[in-house]
Amino acid sequence: MNPAELFTLQATDDRMHWTWQPSSLLLTPAKTLQGGAGLGAATAAMVAVTGRPVVWATAQYLSFASGTAEIELDVTVEVAGHNTTQARCVVSRQGQEILTTHAALGSRSIDRDGVWCTCPDVPPPDSCPEYRFFERRTGHIGDLIDLRLARGRQLDELHGTRGDGAFAVWVRVGRGVHRMTVPELAFIGDLMPLGFADAMGEPVAGNSLDNTIRVGRLVDTEWVLLTTQVQQVVNGFGYGRGELWAEDATLLGDVSQNAVMRLHTHIRALGTPNTASIRPGSGVR
């Protein structure tokens, strides 16, 4: 499957209103829509309305979206300038808001650019072991993506010793080299909470409260290297950021988010999000 097909929207009579039928492959093990996928669909809607590329987008998650029923996306253009548009998109299902997204879109012609951060020196995907997190043959996200551990430890290697907060995993969505898109990067970027386990030294994961993506240069690649840096865990919430690199070390973008910390074993046993204790969320479960 071409990853772009996962974010194909359906137009309606209202150019500001779109619908989307999410694939089951975009669902977490709890059978809820992965937050980055929701952000990705919202950016696709705003690009379709404005005709401009995404520079920055952020999402605030309001409720879980279980299953694959049709989702509605309503775009509002707040400001449309010569080079930049500021827009927002409300993603909902049957009248219940799932997430709200704000974005800046546009481009400018300038002959000066550069990258001042460095892609870490890690082995290529084929030389890295599979990262054992999602179960396969379950009909959800685990059947869509391949994960290869480039830096850090497997969950069963964690014995309470905390890491330095740095973690890296190669991610492949579908097979074959293809041009990266913002929706796909938003989806991959929402895997940032994978880094919390290595940092904490125990098998924890996180439900995203929010997601932010800043877009760099989009190039062709099969694998994306997600490098994460956990910044802090306090009061049951974790804060972290990440960078998205192509196989040729092109910086595709960077991400950041806050997440509700949960034990991975508890999440597996529960099977569904504990909405009685925490309503917002998406992300990795």
Regions from the PLM with identified roles:
Residues 1-285:
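Terminal targeting signals and extreme-terminal segments of soluble enzymes
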